Regions:
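Ligand-binding pocket scaffold of soluble enzyme catalytic domains
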Residues: 20, 24, 34-37, 42-44, ...
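Conserved nucleotidyltransferase catalytic core and NTase-mimicking acidic/glycine-rich helix/loop elements
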Residues: 124-261
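A basic- and aromatic-enriched beta-loop-alpha substructure that forms the phosphate/nucleotide-
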Residues: 76-158
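A structural signal for short, well-ordered beta-strand segments and their strand-loop junctions
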Residues: 45-48, 115-116, 185-188
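Helical scaffold of the NTase/Pol beta-like nucleotidyltransferase catalytic core
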Residues: 1-47
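Aromatic-acidic/polar surface patches that form glycan- and anion
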Residues: 17-22, 95, 165-172
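Active-site nucleotide-donor binding segment shared across nucleotidyl transfer reactions
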Residues: 30-80
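Generic structural signal for hydrophobic core residues of well-folded globular domains
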Residues: 69, 106, 180-187, 263, ...
Length: 268
């Protein structure tokens, strides 16, 4: 490991089930720094994105990541477009983006950004570790469920995407069932983030990597549980207030202000 990495960055303190992931994450962080020229003054964190997060990977799965960076002084002064670039690493794809983009996604209650921030596989800049640990560990379920309407809409969109592909792809079908778990946890008012790793991940993984497509099972899903879920989701929308944006914006703006204020004090 590059010495500067260990000096300036730290793994998040969360339980991890796969000890092979984090050494590769450190390699990715070093590779991203070399390819972008960003160092500890610009890089906030690196987090895992994809199948390892929900235990549906195998030995051939890519390790895809997201790396959040701070804007430069000129980026802020001249209101430049938010930095965003996909970089191929030795293990997969890393999407490097301005941390302000992550907060924009949080304001929409995007399931994708929530997965990234809730990941147990994360490396954080030591200067911001306590603040990010609070956000990504202590308050992540609170943040995720601030606007249940938007959260469910986001999950609903993912669910329908995978549902439309399920007859042609075992991966899509397994992911559709994974999203069902998450939608059900919202409907039952349970801890949403616990289903980021599905309780039935073993059976979902078996479906994902099966050599054949079980059309009969898909028909049962389409006519059975999917129909019941759809009815309950529609009732959920009818009952739910949709005017909670002010509460969401206040909370997300607070976290963004805390982070950016500290960055400006330290670096600018």
């Amino acid at each position: 490991m590059n010495k500067w990495l260990n000096q300036f960055f730290k793994e998040i303190e969360k339980e991890k089930y796969d000890n092979t992931v984090m050494p590769k994450m450190w390699d990715i962080l070093n590779e991203i720094s070399e390819k972008t020229g960003f160092d500890e003054h610009r890089i906030l964190m690196l987090s895992l994105y994809g199948s390892q997060n929900y235990r549906m990977n195998n030995e051939n799965s890519d390790i895809d990541t997201e790396c959040f960076i701070f804007p430069s002084h000129d980026d802020i002064i001249y209101a430049r477009s938010l930095f965003s670039k996909c970089i191929e690493t030795q293990y997969g794809t890393c999407h490097v983006k301005d941390i302000r983009a992550a907060f924009n996604e949080l304001r929409k209650s995007s399931p994708n950004i929530l997965e990234i921030l809730a990941s147990p596989y994360m490396i954080i800049n030591r200067e911001y570790y306590f603040l990010m640990k609070q956000m990504c560990c202590d308050y992540i379920n609170y943040i995720a469920t601030l606007n249940l309407y938007k959260l469910m809409r986001g999950l609903d969109g993912l669910y329908n995407k995978y549902r439309s592909e399920m007859n042609a792809s075992n991966k899509a079908y397994a992911n559709m069932l994974r999203i069902e778990n998450m939608m059900t946890s919202v409907l039952l008012k349970e801890d949403y983030t616990k289903e980021l790793i599905p309780h039935n991940y073993i059976s979902l993984k078996a479906i994902k990597y099966s050599d054949k497509i079980d059309t009969e099972l898909r028909e049962k899903t389409e006519n059975g549980y999917s129909a019941v879920l759809r009815a309950n989701v529609n009732k959920f929308y009818d009952r739910l207030e949709t005017d909670s944006d002010e509460k969401v914006l206040g909370t997300i703006n607070f976290w963004q202000s805390e982070l950016m204020d500290k960055y400006i004090r330290l670096e600018l």
